[in-house]
Regions:
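Internal gly/pro-rich beta-alpha loop/helix module
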Residues: 4-73
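C-terminal non-catalytic interaction/assembly regions of soluble proteins
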Residues: 129-242
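Short coil/turn connectors at secondary-structure junctions
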Residues: 1, 31-35, 40-41, 95-98, ...
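Glycine/charged-rich beta-loop-alpha catalytic/anionic-binding loops adjacent to active sites
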Residues: 1-10, 177-182
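N-terminal small/polar loop signature for handling phosphorylated ligands or for N-terminal nucleophile
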Residues: 1-4, 110-116, 126, 145-151
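Accessory alpha-helical/coil subdomains and C-terminal extensions
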Residues: 46-135, 218-242
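Amphipathic coiled-coil/heptad-repeat helices and related helical stalk/stem segments
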Residues: 18-21, 108, 142
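Short beta-strand segments
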Residues: 3-6, 37-41, 102, 125, ...
Length: 242
């Protein structure tokens, strides 16, 4: 196991949370599941699911889409963790030429289009279930970005700006259009997890289909397994985002 921790207040201060966090982290490493995790404020989180959500509170982390791996109160209780399939392998190679793009009102599509020649992969933080500007009459449609990325063999992984739940590209018209242009659903991965997984997928998988399977398949609990239509097949009737 690899257990990371820290504190909101320095160890030398009277009300520091550092001492208890360190004790809990050591106990989690000895008795908890053999995973990469974060121990903070008497909670053990799966590392690739956790988000820093607070700056000035002791409960600084959250894992909205994944149950806790452990709670450390008067008694410490731990989940069994992931079942390891086969021997562990350390994958050290990462493709660093990736970019995280957050959709925002008024985003000029020319900006991400200019990035495409410089990157090998793109993570798109979309609205809600995977929405983004689609109407070309408004001058800010991102659909040409997906088309150009596909032509350049630059995978685009779509994740949600919402912390809870995840992307379902089959749900609305814009998501279905992105799927038709080769976009990959990031499900309920955090943007950070999606970036690292994309970096690894690009480093180890040159074939487009193999890369897509890798990115959309849970490897170490970084995403919730979803039905196949959520990942790769546009719905026959998709709704317009409202």
């Amino acid at each position: 196991p690899v257990v990371m921790t820290g504190s909101q207040r320095p160890l030398g201060e009277v009300r520091s949370d550092a001492r208890l966090n360190l004790i809990d982290a050591v106990l989690s490493a000895l008795q908890g599941p053999p995973e990469v995790s974060i121990c903070f404020d008497s909670h053990l989180y799966r590392g690739n699911r956790a988000r820093k959500v607070k700056v000035a509170e002791y409960d600084a982390f959250d894992s909205p889409n994944c149950p806790l791996l452990g709670t450390l109160g008067v008694e410490a209780t731990f989940a069994p963790g992931l079942r390891q399939k086969g021997p562990r392998r350390l994958r050290e190679r990462l493709e660093s030429r990736v970019f995280l793009l957050k959709v925002f009102p008024g985003l000029d599509p020319a900006l991400p289009m200019a990035l495409l020649p410089q990157v090998r992969g793109l993570v798109l933080e979309a609205y809600g279930a995977g929405n983004y500007p689609l109407d070309p009459t408004l001058g800010h449609s991102l659909l040409p970005l997906f088309r150009e990325a596909r032509a350049r063999d630059v995978p685009v992984v779509v994740v949600s700006q919402a912390h809870h739940n995840g992307v379902d590209l089959s749900l609305y018209e814009s998501g279905a259009a992105a799927l038709a242009e080769g976009a990959l659903s990031g499900g309920d991965m955090t943007p950070s997890a999606a970036l690292v997984k994309l970096m690894q997928g690009l480093a180890y998988h040159q074939d487009r289909e193999a890369r897509a399977r890798f990115i959309q398949t849970p490897i170490v609990g970084e995403m919730t397994d979803r039905p196949s239509n959520v990942h790769g097949t546009p719905a026959k009737k998709s709704r317009r985002a409202r």
